[in-house]
Design a protein with these regions (language model features):
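Short, intrinsically disordered, charge-balanced linker/junction segments flanking boundaries
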Residues: 217-223
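Ubiquitin-like/PB1-type beta-grasp interaction modules and other compact soluble beta-rich domains
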Residues: 1-206, 210, 218
Length: 223
């Protein structure tokens, strides 16, 4: 978005609480906010990551640095405490990839796992997640299973390969439902795929060797 300190308030809605600033919602168009759970599911809360890592402090305590990429995401808490379901902030290792109509787009989905102190510091592959790609129309475009034009499942290494039959720009995301079939146990990652038209090699015109004209030896006139 290229947001500045002055305009950030148009995109992040926050209020004060006894624990400091509390995020109420985020906005893409700068006009309306949204909850952490689009389906109003229980236990879905806001979190944030900086450069795809856990900053280790609350948002109001983090000091931004040049070129920091801040991601605010909604993530299911995994049920009542103690939490026996690990939920992961997830992201694409390369959030922008390119391919051609005749080629393949390969992405790697990673996530943050928790150490013994419940700090999200362990990078791990996210397997058995469904990667979805939808047509990119504008910066508000999202990819869901309903808008997807291409899907693929990640393997044990978090790798998924997609193919496209039309050139254009596509937005990527992924989801993975928990055993209850309702809650996604990863946050929704974001990426872009640029699909170029297939390059065709022109067929060379056949070369034709001209046929030499026959030579005629004149017959001498009789004397």
């Amino acid at each position: 978005k290229g947001a500045t300190t002055e305009t950030m308030k148009n995109y992040i809605m926050a209020s004060t609480s006894q624990y400091g600033l509390f995020v109420n919602g985020i906005s893409i168009d700068g006009n309306s906010d949204g909850s952490a759970s689009s389906d109003a599911l229980d236990g879905v809360n806001w979190g944030y990551a900086v450069n795809n890592t856990d900053p280790g402090v609350g948002m109001s305590s983090y000091s931004l640095k040049n070129n920091d990429a801040v991601t605010i995401y909604g993530l299911w808490g995994g049920g009542t405490w103690p939490n026996n379901v690990e939920t992961n902030y997830s992201y694409f290792e390369n959030d922008t990839v390119s391919t051609t109509v005749s080629g393949k787009a390969t992405v790697t989905l990673k996530g943050l796992g928790y150490d013994k102190n419940f700090v999200a510091s362990i990078v791990k592959p996210i397997s058995k997640a469904t990667v979805v790609a939808a047509k990119y129309e504008n910066e508000a475009s999202t990819a869901t299973k309903d808008t997807a034009v291409a899907t693929a499942q990640t393997d044990d290494n978090g790798v998924a390969t997609l193919s496209f039959d039309k050139a254009g720009t596509y937005v990527l995301s992924a989801y993975r439902l928990d055993s209850d079939g309702k809650h996604s146990n990863i946050s929704r990652p974001y990426g872009i795929v640029k699909v170029l038209a297939a390059v065709t090699t022109p067929t060379a015109a056949p070369t034709v060797t001209p046929t030499a004209a026959p030579t005629v030896t004149p017959t001498a006139a009789p004397t």
